[in-house]
Amino acid sequence: MKKIMSAFVGMVLLTIFCFSPQASAAYDDLHEGYATYTGSGYSGGAFLLDPIPSDMEITAINPADLNYGGVKAALAGSYLEVEGPKGKTTVYVTDLYPEGARGALDLSPNAFRKIGNMKDGKINIKWRVVKAPITGNFTYRIKEGSSRWWAAIQVRNHKYPVMKMEYEKDGKWINMEKMDYNHFVSTNLGTGSLKVRMTDIRGKVVKDTIPKLPESGTSKAYTVPGHVQFPE
């Protein structure tokens, strides 16, 4: 009986290891799928990254790849290098492609045109997550209605996808839940400035300080400059 149980446990562990995304897929693995194109995603996108320049090359991403490692909106605001029949380009992830299969992207027309023929409408592609072609430090978006009692904070202008955000309270780091709309949420954050800690998709960690949050939850959304950036 002990031998049977040991064998069963071993099979379960092997199955978990083999089929766990975290165990089998690196963040910068090459993905294969298809691309379509759309003119949306520049405003009102699922990840609340407005404003987005109208000439920027952007994409919506399928749900399976978006939530890498089981983290909601893990690839929101990231950059992807996409290759199609005509060449390569780099796009900014701004929206969800809800009906897209794993590997699928819904590109802006200017991005699609660089890698495929518009008349085809749908093309085969390969893509991977790459370091963002940006400069400067983070920017934080404080969502409308935020206060010291409840707050939703978004990290922008990051070189690599942000997987985790924590804040320090009473000498302890408290995890903030990442939401589908690409903000980290928590409650009872305190009355002073907020010490925060961010972890990127590679496991690199940086710390920063955000000015104290509003006392009441009546404020509009606003942004504050950060002082750090993920390392190369």
Swiss-Prot record:
Domain of life: Bacteria
Protein name listed in UniProt: Expansin-YoaJ
One Gene Ontology CC term in the entry: extracellular region
Reported function: May promote colonization of plant roots. May cause loosening and extension of plant cell walls by disrupting non-covalent bonding between cellulose microfibrils and matrix glucans. Has very low expansin activity (in vitro). No enzymatic activity has been found. Binds to peptidoglycan and to plant cell walls.
Keyword Secreted assigned: yes
Source lineage: Bacteria, Bacillati, Bacillota, Bacilli, Bacillales
Record's signal peptide: 1-25
Domain Expansin-like EG45: 58-127
Annotated compartments: Secreted, Cell wall
Major subcellular site: secreted
UniProtKB keywords: Cell wall, Secreted, Signal
